[in-house]
Amino acid sequence: KLKKLIKKKVTIIRAIPMPPIRLGKGPVAIFPPNKKVKIFFDKIGTTIEIKNEKLSKNFWAISGTMASFYELLNVLSNWLIRKKINKLDAQKYVTSLYSALAELALLNSSKPLKNLVNEQTPGGLNWQGVNDLRKLSFYKLLEKSLNKIYKRL
């Protein structure tokens, strides 16, 4: 559509940097793959080159979960606050924990992420937490939300 609008023969690269890019972190999905654009975005984040335009919508859908992530942090922090934990301490603990978990996931991103789930102690607290959420269909609801976001694109 853009090519028709500008009426010039140009190469258009679609890129959507996410807000954490201001920290020099986070993904930038680009379509179509382009060496110069990749080099540019590699300096400020993690460039993901998409080879098929139809597949790009999958990445854009995932970006629609940022507020859900923040809401999860908010719920966890508020739970601690209701347990008489100081608000600042609650938020620092939760955000520091999830930042560290994200770093571990990134370090393991070449392996199946399911491995991190399976590393939890069977019958332990994390095992209980993930299984309670599975029984409540939390993860299925997350996929359902992703499918709705995808349809909007």
Regions found by a protein language model. Give the residues of each.
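Rossmann-like NAD(P)(H) cofactor-binding subdomain of soluble oxidoreductases
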Residues: 1-30, 34-36
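Conserved Rossmann-fold dehydrogenase catalytic segment
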Residues: 20-22, 43-67, 86-88, 113
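A charged, well-structured terminal subsegment
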Residues: 35-54, 126-133, 138-140
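Residues within well-ordered alpha helices
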Residues: 40, 78-83, 104
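An accessory alpha-helical subdomain
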Residues: 65, 79-98, 117-122
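Oxidoreductase and adenylate-handling cofactor-binding alpha/beta cores
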Residues: 71-77
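NAD(P)-dependent Rossmann-like dehydrogenase/reductase catalytic/cofactor-binding core
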Residues: 95, 99-153
